[in-house]
Amino acid sequence: MKTALVLILATATLAVAYPSSTQDYRVVADKTFLTRQRDFLRLLVRIEQPNYYADQYEVGNAYDIEANINNYKYPHVVKNFLSAYKRGMLPRGVPYSPYYTTQSYETKLLFDLFYYANDYDTFYKTVCWARDRINEGQFLYAFSTAVFQREDLSDYILPPPYEIYPYLFVDSEVIQKAYETRMSDVHLTAPKTYIFPVNYTVANPEQELYYWYEDVGLNTYYAYYYFNYPTFFNETEYGVHFDRRGELFYYTRQQLYARQFLERHSHDLGEVEPVHYDRPFQTEYYPRLRYSNGQEVPPRPYEYSRRSLYYSNGNSYYYGNYYGGNNNYYTGNYYTGNYHPSYYYGYSTEHDYYYPEDLQIYDRRVLDSIDYGYVFSYPDHKYPLYEDYTKGIDYLGDVIEGNGDTVNRRYYGSIYHFYRQLAGKNVDPYNDSGFAPSALQNIYTALRDPANFHILKHINSYFQRYKGYLPRYTYDELVFPGVKIENVDVGKLVTYFDYFDVDIDNVVNVKVAEDGKYVDYRARQTRLNHKPFTYNIEVNSEQATDVYVRVFLGPKYDYLGREYDLNDRRHYFVELDRFPYKVQAGKTTITRNSRESSVVSHDYPSFRTLLRKVFDAYEGKEQFYYDKSERYCGYPERLLLPKGKTGGQTYTFYVMVTPYVKQDDHDFEPYNYKSFSYCGVGANHKFPDDKPFGYPFDRVLYSQEFVTPNMYFKDVVIYHKKYEEINAATVQQ
């Protein structure tokens, strides 16, 4: 899925230096590809049930991992996994969280088994074996990450997670209706479609944003980010390099927060307060989700939202992930080198103990490092934050995320994840009630909880403190001599709500594969969309040159109607696009469509559609094409614009043209880098951009000295219309 490292380029006759964004990179799938694609899809059908495809079941049943130890790159990977498996891992049917230490450790062991399989045949037999023996949540996480990371699997398509495991994406009331319908239609003999509307009740202002928080595409983007950049991945162990990984962590979180801010802005809501370990938590949350075993995703009622991360009597607390039996004990050193769990995670207990005092200590250490100018490693080595800004923010981002490349996990912890863990267990801090993992403790649901954005605001404050110490960009650094933007023309910007059907067939059990063909259950959700728009940029240049075009959208007025100072609103500008272009001497008009954005991905093909097309192609009924330029990871194209207003809402459309500085001999070859802005460029590739992410809004600025001829600010108005109005206008056209 990572082959599609492509950068969307402007379509104009003058842009001959780069591939066209309309170029067709589709490839006709051969029999080998179709066989493997079909097998991947079948593996993911009703993953909480035993596999009812007999051939895959037999492959898994007959396979002996230990007897095939030489078919894996490293024998110790097999030994480590089997040692944990024989000792006892998370049982099937138990809710899973990749942020519980023990469960995360087990998932890494399983991923390593998949990742280090020497060839496809070994990989396939291993996943068939694991499909019915490993917890379904762990299996899905490890399998998906392996497909994203293995070079030999890069072209294969995974169905969207909201259709593999709908429980964490669709209202539990709808799931219940699907159960009841299935019970009344046990003996289906022909296909029958049922559509279950997802209804929302807005009980407080925060819930007005339900359509954004609960957008299945947005939450899929967040999950795919972690499949692209697994938290446990590190360069030393896996021998791969993630270019600007720490900076990308910062930028994606900053942009998510800014996009949520713009969505709040469209509802005249103010900015959220940052979370803090010793202050009351303000946001209640009722997820209306439940796991496949029937356990509810825990809510956070108002009375618990009002208390701080300290326990109500002022004492500290921990949370645990104990799930019974002997599964919670890990005493052996299953990692090699420094990657024993107690070393990597900083805790050596079978429970995950997190004290608010720990957060206070980690918080102080990060702030001290920013102020001092160094992050500290083992035993006495230190890495400078301000000598090379690109490396400095990378070090800082790795430290705050606490990923596998952090210079010192023991010393700095993982502030981002620790805050989510503590806030997520706020209702049941001692784990007395045995609650399932909360929304904040799962990659598929974290963005649904508004609390995540309180945490993001706090996380962003570290980076803003760091950026505040960097020198402001000077006029000479910002200007592009000989290049001027003379005008920007933006088409009409219109948002609307439409309807989207999520295939929820996988929530109901069937006995044989044939029965599954007749089950067609769909949850119909309301989602935000916008009409595609085009903008034209008129550039005048003294000579032909390669340029980089950067496009942002930001608020012009605050929620009280007061015009922002540019420096005050720079944090809220969201990136709409970033692309190279070759301008000619004299005047060049750059035309760009919103669907070409390097930020976004488009709707994913549904599970049902993929199954039908692949099976038909496998049987010779039609051809199946896969797109080598498609990444399937990116911000949803539908959400590129914040919701408008009936009478319109004014925003600032900002364009900047900078010199294009080639970073790698393979920049933009052979494809475009689709959705690289928010999903990176994957392992062992360089970002095709020499500027900091978010440039030029990433540093403090003086409004009077900021504007240069190669920039252009344009007031635009975003309107919101009813779906019927959009349809009527389309028919008239």
Swiss-Prot record:
<keyword id="KW-0325">Glycoprotein</keyword>
<feature type="glycosylation site" description="N-linked (GlcNAc...) asparagine">
    <location>
        <position position="431"/>
    </location>
</feature>
<keyword id="KW-0964">Secreted</keyword>
<dbReference type="InterPro" id="IPR013788">
    <property type="entry name" value="Hemocyanin/hexamerin"/>
</dbReference>
<comment type="function">
    <text>Larval storage protein (LSP) which may serve as a store of amino acids for synthesis of adult proteins.</text>
</comment>
<dbReference type="InterPro" id="IPR000896">
    <property type="entry name" value="Hemocyanin/hexamerin_mid_dom"/>
</dbReference>
<dbReference type="InterPro" id="IPR008922">
    <property type="entry name" value="Di-copper_centre_dom_sf"/>
</dbReference>
<comment type="subunit">
    <text>Homohexamer.</text>
</comment>
<dbReference type="Pfam" id="PF03723">
    <property type="entry name" value="Hemocyanin_C"/>
</dbReference>
<dbReference type="GO" id="GO:0005576">
    <property type="term" value="C:extracellular region"/>
</dbReference>
<dbReference type="Pfam" id="PF03722">
    <property type="entry name" value="Hemocyanin_N"/>
</dbReference>
<dbReference type="InterPro" id="IPR005203">
    <property type="entry name" value="Hemocyanin_C"/>
</dbReference>
<feature type="glycosylation site" description="N-linked (GlcNAc...) asparagine">
    <location>
        <position position="199"/>
    </location>
</feature>
<feature type="glycosylation site" description="N-linked (GlcNAc...) asparagine">
    <location>
        <position position="234"/>
    </location>
</feature>
<dbReference type="InterPro" id="IPR005204">
    <property type="entry name" value="Hemocyanin_N"/>
</dbReference>
<protein>
    <recommendedName>
        <fullName>Hexamerin</fullName>
    </recommendedName>
</protein>
<keyword id="KW-0732">Signal</keyword>
<keyword id="KW-0758">Storage protein</keyword>
<dbReference type="InterPro" id="IPR037020">
    <property type="entry name" value="Hemocyanin_C_sf"/>
</dbReference>
<dbReference type="Pfam" id="PF00372">
    <property type="entry name" value="Hemocyanin_M"/>
</dbReference>
<feature type="signal peptide">
    <location>
        <begin position="1"/>
        <end position="17"/>
    </location>
</feature>
<dbReference type="InterPro" id="IPR036697">
    <property type="entry name" value="Hemocyanin_N_sf"/>
</dbReference>
<dbReference type="InterPro" id="IPR014756">
    <property type="entry name" value="Ig_E-set"/>
</dbReference>
<dbReference type="GO" id="GO:0045735">
    <property type="term" value="F:nutrient reservoir activity"/>
</dbReference>
<comment type="similarity">
    <text>Belongs to the hemocyanin family.</text>
</comment>
